[in-house]
């Protein structure tokens, strides 16, 4: 009798953990239900006026797994070989994440390509890629913009939050020589590490994470363990500027030091005092612009 009770209890516990893990995966990774479009972030009146005067082209590619992915392109005012590819973060969309950055880069003569990540904005997709699937999409966008302009380019990849993880994960792949440098703002070391941190912060039982990791490959198309930013960064040959706020509790600040130390390419590090997650530019735009400019000038011809 006791053996039957133990067996039944074990099976029931396993079922509950498995079901709870699937619920946790879907909560973190499933595309959110269509909500009212979030307003653009932290725009001044001058920013709003400037933005209202710009014309954006709409571009589209098909991902390797058949999704229609869409992007906005803001062309430079004059002939230019400089392109910024700007990758937004989790539960955001292209223009919302980068509206306050656009004028800075545009005034420097950049064409600016802003994709909507899979399962975000105008792009298709049921599950969020957390940078791992997006790294391949990012490389497709690089090739698409090369074909669009049909010339040699100087490409800078800029990512914020999950977008930062995307460009860093892409850096571990073979990138075209047109990619000159990366600006990485508040990226995480791996999907597993970020999930672990968020579970702890949200008081979700950590026992769910190993099971969720086992189930994630089948559920969302990648394992939380394999989706490692830090392992990709170790392979990177692309000069990278790492930016992080010292008050970030969503992607904890220690992660940027781990990423910086793992990077064997040319690199620099900016820690912005008083900045929470994805707030570095908002807290200190002058410092961020100065540091980005100095870094880019080493690798991009102006």
Give the role of each language-model region.
Residues 169-223, 231:
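Hydrolase active-site cap/lid region
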Residues 104-124:
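Conserved alpha/beta-hydrolase
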Residues 260-278, 291:
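Catalytic histidine neighborhood in serine/cysteine hydrolases
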Residues 90-104, 117:
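The serine-hydrolase catalytic nucleophile loop
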Residues 283-302:
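Catalytic active-site module of serine/aspartate enzymes centered on a nucleophile-bearing elbow/loop
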Residues 128-149:
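Alpha/beta-hydrolase active-site loop
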Residues 7-62, 72:
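An N-terminal hydrophobic leader/cap segment in hydrolases
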Residues 235-237, 242-244, 248:
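Short beta-strand/loop motif that positions the catalytic acidic residue
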